[in-house]
């Protein structure tokens, strides 16, 4: 088992649903975890598919909650958005953009391939300073409440297994292969350096 706790980041597009559900579950299990989005703005479903609610990453979850409560309490209660924002504001004040974070992680989990590509591109564009490896793993999770919950438990199980490896660098590929077979999902994996 590693001598220090695994430093984990979970990343989706808007730091609202998938990454926050995983953040919630991982932090309850005692992991050192942060969550992020990679988008230029935070997008939440609106009254129609072509009318999302768009916010800046500086907007707090509380401000978003109150804005949607004012706009249409019934709609945003019924579709679960207010419940999700209520959970989010109990975890941290506002969404965060991955590209603005300078913290180092051992493991970064992304929730869709486009986000994985953005994270890898960002890490590769940074100046390498410590040559410390960071494993970036993509677990495809559909962006709805049910899939976010299932995906978060899968991410948690994966983190627990990685936390208990003797040698993460040499065991992670085999571990991911086992998880692929067990879950029926394909994982993307690469190593970047800080």
Curated annotation (Swiss-Prot):
Q: Give the GO molecular function terms.
A: RNA polymerase II CTD heptapeptide repeat phosphatase activity
Q: Which domain of life is it from?
A: Eukaryota
Q: Where in the cell is the protein located?
A: Nucleus; Cytoplasm
Q: In which tissues is it expressed?
A: Highly expressed in the brain. Expressed at low level in most tissues.
Q: What's a Pfam family in this record?
A: Ssu72
| E.C. no | 3.1.3.16
Broadest EC class? hydrolase
GO CC term (a single one): cytosol
What catalytic reaction does the record list? O-phospho-L-seryl-[protein] + H2O = L-seryl-[protein] + phosphate; O-phospho-L-threonyl-[protein] + H2O = L-threonyl-[protein] + phosphate
Question: Where is this protein chiefly located?
Answer: nucleus
- Described function: Protein phosphatase that catalyzes the dephosphorylation of the C-terminal domain of RNA polymerase II. Plays a role in RNA processing and termination. Plays a role in pre-mRNA polyadenylation via its interaction with SYMPK.
Q: Which PANTHER family is this protein grouped with?
A: RNA POLYMERASE II SUBUNIT A C-TERMINAL DOMAIN PHOSPHATASE
Oligomeric form and interacting partners: Interacts with GTF2B (via C-terminus); this interaction is inhibited by SYMPK. Interacts with RB1. Interacts with CD226. Interacts with SYMPK.
State what protein this is by name. Answer: RNA polymerase II subunit A C-terminal domain phosphatase SSU72
- The gene that this protein is the product of is Ssu72
């Amino acid at each position: 088992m590693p001598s220090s706790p695994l430093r984990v980041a979970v990343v989706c597009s808007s730091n609202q649903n998938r990454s926050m559900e995983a953040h919630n579950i991982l932090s309850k299990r005692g992991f050192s975890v942060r969550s992020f989005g990679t988008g230029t703005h935070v997008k939440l479903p609106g009254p129609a598919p072509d009318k999302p609610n768009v916010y800046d990453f500086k907007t707090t979850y509380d401000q978003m909650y109150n804005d949607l409560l004012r706009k249409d309490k019934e709609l945003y209660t019924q579709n679960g958005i207010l419940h999700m924002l209520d959970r989010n504001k109990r975890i941290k004040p506002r969404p965060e953009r991955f590209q603005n974070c300078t913290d180092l992680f051992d493991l970064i989990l992304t929730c869709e391939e486009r986000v994985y590509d953005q994270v890898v591109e960002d890490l590769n564009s940074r100046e390498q300073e410590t040559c410390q490896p960071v494993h970036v793993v993509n677990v495809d999770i559909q962006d709805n409440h049910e899939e976010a919950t299932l995906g978060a438990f899968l991410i948690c199980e994966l983190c627990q297994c990685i936390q208990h490896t003797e040698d993460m660098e040499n065991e992670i590929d085999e571990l991911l292969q086992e998880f692929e077979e067990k879950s029926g999902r394909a994982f993307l994996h690469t190593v970047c350096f800080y």
